[in-house]
Amino acid sequence: MKFNRIAIIAILAILTVVLAGSASAFDLGFLGGGDSEAQQITVGGIDFNIPAGFTENEDYKMDNEKSNSTTGVDYTMSAAGFEDDKKEKAIYILVGDYRDYNVTDQVIEYVLDGMDYEKKTINGHDGYLVQQNTTGSSSLMATEQPVYMFVYEENGDLVFIGATDESYFGDVIIE
């Protein structure tokens, strides 16, 4: 029973991010600015590297925001979003802390059910790589743009990283 509650909440957290990314074709036009130096950040108590050329938009930062869970499993989410100056490249990080419950591979696989995913290890972290195509629009025609997601467990928390380029995961995730 506890597994089902955690899985449902994890699904809701990931779907929120996926739907937001799909709706904007992961353009993330809400992010702006630029930074020429790489930086190290902490989201939900976990350290990440952000490559040079990306800047965080504080408007989209979440810091231990409590859920409005109706399932009885309380959790908090922390998140940060980054984009380059041209608003063509983006990185989004979300960490879900389920308090007394630990996220497991079984929970993540349940959450990703129905999605095409590949088990992968990035910088020593075993997780799940998902690629989805989102429809964006140029001035004259619709285009298909890939969005990549890497989902894994760290310290019992759910870690979700979304990016416009799969190669960013190796830069963002710290060994």
Describe every region a protein language model picked out.
Residues 52, 86-87, 125, 151-158:
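Short, solvent-exposed coil/turn segments at beta-strand boundaries
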Residues 3, 26-33, 43, 48, ...:
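Short, aromatic- and cysteine-enriched interfacial helices/patches
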Residues 1-32:
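Secretory targeting signatures
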Residues 54, 154-175:
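Surface-exposed amphipathic alpha-helical segments
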Residues 35-40, 72-79, 122-138:
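Short, hydrophobic/aromatic-rich segments at coil-to-beta transitions
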Residues 36-38, 54-56, 60, 114-117, ...:
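Short glycine-aromatic motifs
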Residues 108-150, 154:
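Signature of long, low-cysteine stretches enriched in small and polar/charged residues
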Residues 50-101, 139:
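Secretory pathway targeting signatures of secreted, lumenal, and periplasmic proteins
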